[in-house]
Amino acid sequence: MVGGSTVASGVEMEDVVKRIKANVRIPVIIFPNNIASITGAADAMWFMSLLNSANTYYLIDSQAIGAPMVKKLGLETMPMGYIIVGYGGAAGYVGQARVIPYDRPELAVAYASAAELLGMRYIYLEAGSGAPQPVSPIMISAVSKYCKSTLVVGGGIRDAKAAIAAKIAGAQIIVTGTLVEEESKVMDRIREITTALTAQA
């Protein structure tokens, strides 16, 4: 996944994607914050709606503006309902989200259910980059129980313990973005997390 809440340059985004693809043999998926994130250099993109935003730009306007470009580029799209909870971080601030409190899992279930009924194949529960605590296992479990869409969870997951807790609760994809930016021995930490998750399977 390549992207973030403060990406402002399409040229920069394309350069980053090309550099990654030149060094890593795995698909690169765009995690967009607006139309500046779109690049044909990627393999696919999350075509997402920030469901609890108070601003229609993040709900549907940016998607409508960007859709013709996405179709022209022939990018594979992965429809996602994006839900910001708890801390929220930069994503919550930039996206003008009405952040769902950690202790209100029923609200997350309601938004996730709406995403599923709208045909979104993925649901992302986001606590925000660098969140002091991750999405609670109770909230993850509640959404997993009521929704069949693939469940993505991110924000505040810094170690194997937190990743395993999210997986046991029902997360099917786990995002550890800020870890790459903050950890000096990033490969060791990622290996620790992936090894623990594989062993828990």
Predicted regions and their residues:
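Alpha-helix-loop-beta-strand connector modules within alpha/beta enzyme cores
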Residues: 10-34, 66-78, 133-159, 190-201
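Alpha/beta catalytic cores of nucleotide-metabolism and tRNA/nucleoside-modifying enzymes
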Residues: 77-83, 88-89, 103-110, 145, ...
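Metabolite-binding pocket within alpha/beta catalytic cores that recognizes anionic/polar moieties
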Residues: 1-61
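Conserved anion-binding
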Residues: 37-116
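Glycine-rich phosphate-binding active-site loops on the catalytic face of alpha/beta enzymes
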Residues: 1-7, 44, 48-59, 127, ...
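Structural preference for beta-strand elements that scaffold enzyme active sites
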Residues: 1, 27-29, 44, 80-84, ...
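Catalytic cores of alpha/beta
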Residues: 30, 34-47, 146-176
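Glycine/Thr-rich beta-alpha phosphate-binding loop at enzyme active sites
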Residues: 3, 94-140, 181-183, 189
